A protein has these predicted regions:
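An exposed, glycine/acidic-rich loop-and-rim segment of catalytic or binding clefts
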Residues: 1-156
Length: 156
């Protein structure tokens, strides 16, 4: 079972001006069809490294980021826009976070009108034995928790 919330967020300005911070040190690379290959790759020093606040700019994201401490409620991501003094924090018990910058959006929305921060299990997990198991057996119970918190921030 791999349920995810595909809501789009925009804190009031152009998406390129939003800044992102991720609590992830790894991600799952994909093939030419955007299907995870089974590899878990490090982020440190790569263009996908959001371990410090970084403006989204024109970077197109549609990547699954691996979160530490699977099963514990912890911060997965923070998104902020200094111009509006707004910040969104995403907390979850899920093992991964799909980040999508909406580059493929079309009518009635424009490309990059929002960003998805989707707490989830690993995509393609049933076909990748090294990914966390997402199979829910008969009689099993599925529980997960995801919190979206909004707050005002001070301008610096």
């Amino acid at each position: 079972m791999n349920l995810a919330n595909h809501a789009y967020f925009n804190l009031g300005g152009h998406l390129s001006e939003h800044e992102l911070l991720l609590n992830a040190g790894e991600y799952t690379p994909v093939n030419h069809r955007l299907i995870p290959t089974g590899e878990i790759a490090p982020l440190k020093g790569s263009a996908l490294d959001y371990s410090d606040w970084k403006a989204l700019g024109d970077t197109a994201l549609d990547h699954n980021f691996v979160l530490p401490e699977d099963g514990k409620l912890r911060r997965a991501a923070s998104l902020r826009l200094r111009a509006t003094q707004l910040q969104l924090d995403v907390l979850t018990t899920q093992p991964a976070l799909q980040v999508y910058t909406g580059d493929g959006l079309n009518t009635p929305f424009a490309p990059r009108s929002g960003i998805c921060l989707e707490a989830q299990g690993f995509p393609n997990a049933p076909n990748q034995p090294n990914f966390p198991n997402i199979v829910l057996e008969p009689g099993g119970t599925y529980r997960q928790r995801t919190i979206y918190q909004f707050k005002k921030i001070a301008t610096a």
